[in-house]
Design a protein with these regions (language model features):
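Phosphopantetheine-dependent thiolation modules in NRPS/PKS and related acyl-activating systems
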Residues: 2-37, 41-46, 51-80
Length: 80
């Protein structure tokens, strides 16, 4: 899976988790950009990504995430 495919999958997951059908994400999108992105929805997002891509994040990986691009990079490294 390439970076664009991963970003597209993450966008679909985020649309579902945040209930925003028209949400468009870029690698620079962060929690500050999405009003619905609070601590509870963040947990739901992480769980949904883990289920979709069939892996578990390490706490250190989660701590280092600053935006969707960072998230996509971790997913890519875990699914390569």
């Amino acid at each position: 899976m390439n970076a664009e495919d991963i970003l597209s999958e993450i966008q679909d997951i985020m649309r579902d988790v945040f209930d925003l059908d028209d949400l468009v994400v870029t690698p620079n999108t962060s929690a500050e950009d999405v009003e619905e992105w609070d601590s509870l929805s963040h947990v739901r997002l992480i769980v949904a990504i883990e289920r979709k891509f069939k892996f578990k994040f390490k706490n250190s990986e989660l701590d280092s995430l600053k935006n969707v691009g960072d998230l996509a990079n971790v997913v890519k490294s875990k699914t390569a």
